[in-house]
Regions:
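Sec-dependent signal peptide recognition
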Residues: 1-3
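N-terminal signal peptide c-region/cleavage motif recognized by signal peptidases
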Residues: 5-7
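N-terminal alpha-helical modules
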Residues: 9-157
């Protein structure tokens, strides 16, 4: 659980990933239904009295984005380790195949600027409005959650 105390009069906000985890536990990670779980915990956080302010919304959305980012980094590491081992085995066997590790790295490096551009566009749609900060955090949360789930669906394949 992550806490925010007294930020700009927001009082105490707490982010707990429980709602998202519960949703994921009931979904099949290989199906699009898992995508519906993205934002569940941020929504629960924003449903609290202090979560409905602009500062509160930004905090809640950012907290879930950071949670998904940690999850994405963990699954990326798992996949990279497995892919490096598979690439080494293919080389040992003399099989010329595209590198899984290099392909994963290239894909992830291309995805990051896509995510950033998509969320820059989301921010731009708000002009100078105060909702732009939470909108950007929400976009980053959704894009990162989708990428984490996409990579998680590759585990065990």
């Amino acid at each position: 659980m992550v806490m925010l105390a007294g930020a700009a009069g927001a009082g105490d906000l707490a982010f707990d990933p429980g709602a998202t985890l519960s949703c994921l536990a009931q979904s099949d990670l290989n199906r699009s239904g898992a995508f519906d779980c993205i934002g569940r915990s941020a929504s629960a956080c924003m449903a609290t009295p202090d979560g409905g302010t602009t500062v509160g919304m930004g905090y809640c959305l950012n907290a879930e984005w950071q949670w998904w980012d940690a999850r994405l980094n963990a699954v990326y590491s798992q996949l990279m380790n497995g892919h490096r081992a598979a690439d080494a085995e293919m080389a040992r066997l003399g099989i010329a195949a595209p590198s899984l590790a290099d392909s994963l790295q290239a894909m992830q490096r291309a995805w990051i600027p896509f995510r950033d551009a998509a969320c820059d566009y989301e921010r731009a749609t708000w002009g100078n409005g105060t909702g732009g900060g939470p909108a950007t955090a929400g976009c980053l949360m959704v894009q990162t959650g989708r990428q984490a789930l996409a990579l998680e669906s590759r585990l065990g394949q």
